[in-house]
Amino acid sequence: MKAFAVLFVLSLIKTELRPSYGLPLLQSGLYNTNQIFQKTQTLPPFIQDSNSTLPAPSTTNLPETNKLASHLQHRLSRSLLSANTTTPKTGGELRGLPTDDPWVVAGFVTLGVVAGGLVLILCYLYTPCCAYLVILCCWFKKWGPY
């Protein structure tokens, strides 16, 4: 039970940090694209890239019905029209921290070390290691970043 409490707290922390890194708040499988994105009759203009041809994001394609739709539109526009288009993006790149302030970076590192230490202590004291690893793997599979 304590392991689930720790995983619940980690889920809350992760939910609070997701908007800072530009990640969606819900899993991608929960989005119904027919409700968020409107279908259009016209084809968007294309951006010619050295590796591929990508459709340019159009601001008229997305409804402004709620904050989630406008947030997704903003993130989509920023990801497709990035300044560095010469480097191919494979989807596995690490995202930078949202700020360059060294105190914020030190705070994130400290938070990670403390959370990791608490998980290790709970793993050692309260549950057998094998069972805890199974619980942790299931948690990452369901609520993990991918």
Curated annotation (Swiss-Prot):
The keyword Glycoprotein applies. InterPro entries: Adeno_E3. The keyword Glycoprotein applies. Transmembrane segments: none annotated. Coiled coil: none annotated. Keywords: Early protein, Glycoprotein. It comes from the Viruses. Signal peptide: none annotated. Glycans are attached at N51, N84. E3 proteins seem to be dispensable for virus growth in tissue culture cells. They are potentially important for virus growth under special conditions; E3 region may help adenoviruses to evade the immune surveillance of the host. This is Early E3 16 kDa glycoprotein.
